[in-house]
């Protein structure tokens, strides 16, 4: 088992690089994108095209209906099944490529996060939410002091999740968390660009998405699932939904999408820069593929030498 991750801010060229590397390695690509797991959300999520999926096998995309929820634990389980037992899933030989910008997905794999196996309980969450955040936080203080020290008093989502895990499993969430590092080699590659260059790439990509049918995609999704579908409030879709509602012009929707995407990229950069194991490359470098390929070959050569010892 060997894993190569390719991470970094959006629009840095992760998917293209992964496609080239996977083709050279004869490997598969696992998506680490929290929106590409959903069917029908294609253009706005920059999902690999049918042609790209035919060139290299992609997994963990289109595995959920837009109305479903995939927990982090479920994602981790599915990803690990490919990484640890690729022969049972495909005819492709490792290394496996894990590619995307959802930091928590990648962390769940490379850090081996221990995640409570408690699924969402909407009825319980609703009952707790009706009590108000202040009361819920007091309840959490009584049952899990360790979790309280890590959760801000105003963090409704994490407070409800901690209480949900406790009441469903009978054990504090803090006792069900931690890390269990994988026992296989991992090479972590990160792509980034100069801020202004990345801004231009984001603008170009957004305009391209609109050209190839993003507005039509959003319109169809609204008609099929209703405008209140949570996924339609995410980056790119929310802005185009505003345009379709007549609240803003198309130019304004594009401008807002670019701005929000740049803000998102900044948050992604902050997240990934917190992990010193990641080896960074300039996503705008003309010889990017050659540089990364050289590092990958070095990585695989060292592993081969260790295996022969």
Curated annotation (Swiss-Prot):
A single GO BP: tRNA modification
Enzyme Commission number(s): 2.5.1.75
Record field: catalytic activity: adenosine(37) in tRNA + dimethylallyl diphosphate = N(6)-dimethylallyladenosine(37) in tRNA + diphosphate
Record keywords, A-Z: ATP-binding, Magnesium, Nucleotide-binding, Transferase, tRNA processing
Cofactors that this protein relies on: Mg(2+)
Catalytic EC class: transferase
Gene Ontology MF term list: ATP binding; tRNA dimethylallyltransferase activity
Site entry: Interaction with substrate tRNA: 102
InterPro entries: Dimethylallyltransferase (IPR039657), IPT (IPR018022), P-loop_NTPase (IPR027417)
Residues binding substrate, per UniProt: 10-15
Residues the entry annotates as binding ATP: 8-15
Family: Belongs to the IPP transferase family.
Protein task: Catalyzes the transfer of a dimethylallyl group onto the adenine at position 37 in tRNAs that read codons beginning with uridine, leading to the formation of N6-(dimethylallyl)adenosine (i(6)A).
Assembly description: Monomer.
Protein name: tRNA dimethylallyltransferase
Native organism: Trichodesmium erythraeum (strain IMS101)
Origin organism lineage: Bacteria, Bacillati, Cyanobacteriota, Cyanophyceae, Oscillatoriophycideae
